[in-house]
């Protein structure tokens, strides 16, 4: 496993809320293929759309498992990142969340927040600014990702028997 990629992804995650284009550039540079689950557009954190494309769109857990399996069997380097849109009913209004993010980022700068304190600070500030709606969205995103990850893992286990 390429440790420089796994170490760097934490930094990318912190900046993800700020610059998805930069995140995609970083991932491409480090050989990480970005897959959209049921979408050709990279989902943003709180919304289903970002305006950025993904490398491939796959529509079933079976397809995801096959992609991981084939990559492993061929010994290809780099990673695969599956991006899974937030369920529609929990997607936030883009203007509302963009405004909250911008305000939270500005407050973080004013308060001298940096390093590993950045993500918790931003998430808490955005939660406050959205009256808790961002937390509800975040929780549903986690549940949705867990369901997809579990389904893909079941399918991958069938391929690797």
Language model region names:
Residues 17-21:
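Short glycine/serine/threonine-rich phosphate/pyrophosphate-binding segments
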Residues 1-13:
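Single conserved hydrophobic/aromatic residue that forms the stacking wall/gate
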Residues 7, 29-32, 41-42, 76-79:
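Short coil/turn connectors at secondary-structure junctions
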């Amino acid at each position: 496993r390429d440790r420089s990629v796994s170490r760097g992804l934490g930094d990318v995650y912190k900046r993800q809320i700020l610059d998805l284009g930069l995140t995609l550039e970083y991932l491409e540079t480090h050989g990480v293929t970005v897959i959209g689950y049921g979408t050709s557009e990279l989902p943003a954190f709180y919304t289903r759309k970002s305006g950025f494309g993904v490398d491939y769109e796959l529509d079933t857990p079976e397809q995801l498992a096959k992609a991981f399996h084939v990559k492993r069997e061929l010994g290809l380097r780099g990673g695969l990142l599956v991006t899974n849109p937030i369920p529609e009913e929990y997607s936030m209004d883009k203007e509302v969340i963009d405004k909250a993010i911008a305000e939270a980022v500005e407050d973080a700068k004013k308060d001298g927040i940096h390093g590993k304190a950045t993500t918790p600070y931003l998430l808490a500030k955005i939660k406050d600014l959205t009256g808790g709606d961002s937390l509800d969205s975040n929780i549903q995103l986690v549940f949705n990702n867990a369901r997809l990850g579990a389904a893909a893992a079941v399918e991958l286990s069938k391929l690797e028997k």
